[in-house]
């Protein structure tokens, strides 16, 4: 028998006067998954998370966390989630340990249990060395860790993270990403972001939102094969640009191509074939016939950025 999903969402809709923020969302998240909500600003990511965190009522549909309805059992749901909103509100005049003890008591933990859990999350989130410091004196990266520790302190079934690396420098981003991956070994995590590498490096599954609707849901690896059943070929060739364009435009097996300059006289040609076609022999033959200098010929794969652009463009075309 399969365990109950940690998140169950069915036909979830949120309307505001004059606009619909999310429309008919349905998805599940299983135990131990790190699932990314990916989409541009305004796609409905934060709205979805606020509904799951009981911060915002839906207009229609159902949502359950660990088997409990977020609308009729909101108190029980709040006990089972740890939520880090995008704004990460903290008491900046409190010390780290003091703040986490305060938050643990607010979440219903006993004095003894609070002490044990605060010690645990300080270690887990790399905060032990700054536990006596005032939060307002910490860097943005450490403040984000305090927010994560707060979300973890009551041992929730689900951790909800809304844009957890926004505003951080590259070093802080890497540090927080690694922390999230480590937490994913023990917790179910739902993370929202508009940063494509964030999902690729952190998440086991992706939900792509566009204009309040889910347009794709799969693993990053499967999504990278979703645009075409053919395998993209990357060729770096030194040749006149017009010759390359003419060759790919008149090659019947090439469904789509992009040409970008590389170093020197070389161009990077990204060639998407028709389904089931391997373009490499044809590219090699063309290079030989035209005396092009070919220095690289490999299978490529679509980036999440290409997938996102493709899916949202396709979605817009279907609604016209």
Residue spans of the language-model regions?
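ABC transporter nucleotide-binding domain
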Residues: 177-274
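A generic structural signal for secondary-structure junctions
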Residues: 82, 108, 126, 147, ...
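Positions that flank functional sites
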Residues: 119, 137, 263-264, 302
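ABC transporter nucleotide-binding domains
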Residues: 4-9, 14-211, 215-216
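C-terminal coupling/interaction segments
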Residues: 3, 274-320
């Amino acid at each position: 028998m399969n365990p109950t999903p940690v998140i169950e969402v069915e036909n979830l809709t949120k309307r505001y006067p004059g606009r619909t923020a999310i429309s008919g969302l349905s998805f599940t998240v299983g135990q131990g998954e790190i699932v990314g909500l990916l989409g541009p600003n305004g796609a409905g990511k934060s709205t979805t998370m606020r509904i799951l965190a009981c911060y915002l009522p839906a207009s229609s549909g159902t949502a359950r966390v660990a088997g409990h309805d977020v609308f009729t059992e909101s108190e029980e749901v709040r006990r089972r989630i740890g939520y880090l909103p995008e704004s990460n509100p903290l008491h900046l005049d409190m010390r780290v340990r003091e703040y986490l003890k305060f938050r643990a008591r607010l979440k219903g933990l006993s004095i003894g249990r609070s002490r044990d859990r605060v010690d645990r999350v300080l270690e887990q989130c790399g905060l032990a060395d700054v536990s006596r410091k005032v939060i307002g004196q910490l860097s943005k990266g450490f403040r984000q860790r305090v927010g994560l520790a707060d979300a973890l302190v009551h041992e929730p079934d689900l951790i909800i993270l809304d844009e957890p690396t926004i505003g951080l420098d590259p070093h802080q981003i890497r540090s927080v990403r690694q922390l999230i991956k480590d937490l994913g070994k023990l917790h179910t995590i739902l993370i929202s972001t508009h940063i494509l590498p964030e999902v690729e490096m952190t998440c086991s599954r992706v939900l792509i939102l566009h204009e309040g609707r889910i347009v794709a849901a799969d693993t990053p690896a499967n999504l990278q094969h979703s645009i075409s059943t053919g395998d993209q070929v990357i060729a770096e060739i030194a040749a006149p640009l017009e010759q390359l364009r003419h060759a790919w435009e008149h090659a019947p097996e090439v469904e789509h191509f992009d040409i970008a300059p590389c170093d020197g006289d070389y161009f990077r040609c990204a060639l998407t074939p028709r389904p089931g076609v391997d373009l490499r022999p044809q590219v090699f033959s063309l290079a030989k016939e035209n005396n092009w200098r070919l220095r690289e010929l490999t299978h490529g794969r679509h980036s999440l950025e290409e997938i996102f652009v493709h899916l949202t463009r396709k979605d817009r075309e279907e609604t016209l």
